[in-house]
């Protein structure tokens, strides 16, 4: 309602170190593992592209594919004009999600069918499994858009869209409070709706993994085997022809995640510098240049990380 950025508001919290609020310092510390995770997503996108190429009879090294994707993302993000790409990818991502839901339904008519009792038993807490796989499960769920970085990026997106201007800056206006409450209600509904959609879109992957991969005894290991092993959730439920749907959908989802993740991650960078008194908030031109240069370099850094640690599962964890 104030138009303030996320980090400017966070920096007002009590508990400062060297003049900066401790959540800001925590965010800076989290930058390294966050960038490593982005390198893992780049690696996954590269491996999915390599797998797609192999289906077409074109063998391309996964690392090379990752490098190509990093360069393409760097060019797209540095221009700042990728709305057309987001618009094109949205229906494809929705289509792949619907295909995954179809796989869950189709699975019930195969040897991999799961009973309601099995689903209920799977919802019961198992602390042994939690300790063993908590990091992987939480990190995987976090990359669906529920991490603190995504939450902060959402606020920047709202400001860039100009939504706070609908409320107005004059708090003495008789209708200001009513507009502010209405806007906050819209945000609440938006967040709840997003949470429901993300959860409903994520659960089918867990069900397919437990129902198909677990019963087949498949444990994906290594970059080359992981994408191929995961394709079984489609081929074993819909048929071998569905490997094309899986490979194309997996690439689109990972590529769109790379674009949105890197694009969102660039917005807070000038804000960090402002709160650390390194640049002036009023210098809008400099802030835009920083974002553009950062978004041009970030994909290349993520690729270098993957080059040194060529295992996207480990990086995402």
Task: Give the positions of each predicted feature.
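Flexible loop linkers connecting adjacent transmembrane helices
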Residues: 1-19, 49-53, 216-237, 268-273
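Membrane-water interface regions at transmembrane-helix termini and the short interhelical loops
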Residues: 47-56, 69-92, 103-110, 305-316
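Hydrophobic alpha-helical segments and their helix-loop junctions in multi-pass secondary transporters
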Residues: 94-156
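Hydrophobic transmembrane alpha-helices that form the core helical bundles
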Residues: 20-56, 254-274
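Select transmembrane alpha-helical segments in multipass membrane proteins
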Residues: 16-33, 65-68, 129-141, 200, ...
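Loop-to-transmembrane helix boundary motifs in multi-pass membrane proteins
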Residues: 58-68, 241, 273-307
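Extracellular/periplasmic helix-exit of transmembrane alpha-helices
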Residues: 1, 158-159, 165, 196-228
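Juxtamembrane inter-helical linkers in multi-pass membrane proteins
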Residues: 5-9, 158-187, 219-229, 271-283
């Amino acid at each position: 309602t104030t138009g303030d950025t996320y980090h400017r508001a966070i920096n007002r919290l009590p508990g400062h170190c060297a003049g900066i609020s401790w959540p800001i310092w925590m965010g800076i510390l989290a930058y390294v593992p966050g960038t490593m995770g982005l390198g893992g997503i780049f690696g996954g996108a590269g491996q999915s592209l390599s797998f797609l190429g192999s289906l077409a009879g074109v063998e391309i090294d996964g690392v090379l594919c990752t490098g190509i994707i990093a360069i393409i993302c760097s060019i797209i993000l540095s221009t700042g004009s990728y709305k057309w790409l987001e618009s094109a990818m949205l229906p494809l991502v929705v289509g792949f999600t619907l295909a995954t839901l179809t796989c869950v339904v189709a699975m019930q008519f195969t040897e991999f069918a799961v009973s309601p009792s099995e689903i209920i038993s799977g919802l019961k807490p198992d602390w042994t499994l939690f300790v063993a796989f908590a990091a992987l499960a939480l990190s995987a769920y976090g990359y669906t858009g529920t991490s603190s970085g995504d939450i902060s990026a959402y606020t920047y997106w709202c400001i860039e869209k100009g939504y706070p201007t609908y409320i107005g800056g004059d708090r003495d206006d008789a209708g200001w409070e009513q507009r502010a409450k209405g806007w906050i209600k819209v945000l609440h509904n938006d967040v709840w709706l997003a949470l429901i959609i993300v959860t409903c879109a994520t659960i089918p992957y867990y069900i397919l993994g437990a129902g198909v991969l677990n019963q087949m005894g498949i444990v994906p290991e290594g970059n080359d085997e992981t994408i191929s092993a995961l394709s079984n959730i489609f081929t074993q439920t819909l048929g071998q022809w569905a490997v094309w749907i899986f490979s194309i959908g997996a690439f689109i989802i990972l590529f769109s995640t790379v674009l949105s993740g890197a694009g969102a991650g660039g917005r807070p960078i000038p804000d960090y510098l402002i709160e650390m008194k390194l640049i002036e908030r009023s210098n809008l031109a400099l802030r835009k240049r920083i974002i553009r240069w950062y978004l041009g370099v970030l994909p290349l850094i993520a690729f270098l990380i993957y080059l040194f640690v060529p295992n996207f599962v480990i990086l995402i964890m």
